[in-house]
Amino acid sequence: MVYISDVSWISEESWAVLDQPSVSDPSHQYAVAVVDCLRPLAHISHYGIKESVNVARRINAKRTYLTGFGHEVSHDEYVTVGEYVGGKVAENPTDKEKDYIDLVDEGKSIWLRPSHDGLRIEVSCEGVVKDNSYSHEE
């Protein structure tokens, strides 16, 4: 698991540590990543949506959860952005959802959703990730 909170930049030295292969998992795919995302646009000390998605894609965890939100974006709007990042075309997105999706660079489809109070994440010995909110989507 990798947890990246209250950050607006990751040095190449830190990326070198994050990118190292693991003895127990030579494929080096993290099961879970938790990535900072304060608001739609970046802040001096926090990622915005674009930066969070770019970091999540580089980490390439089986599941990525965003955390550290302000109040500008609703939970459901973050879910719509996460579904888009995963390759789903939004049906009837709101104008705000369209604006947030427009912030995201083109790139690899990954699983990404907002975290929330009470979220429980379980990782099995085999690396299967389940949670108490989104596992029904599979």
Language model segments and positions:
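Conserved beta-strand hairpin/beta-sheet module of binuclear metal-dependent hydrolase folds
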Residues: 1-6
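Binuclear metal-ion centers of metallo-dependent hydrolases, dominated by the metallo-beta-lactamase
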Residues: 11-138
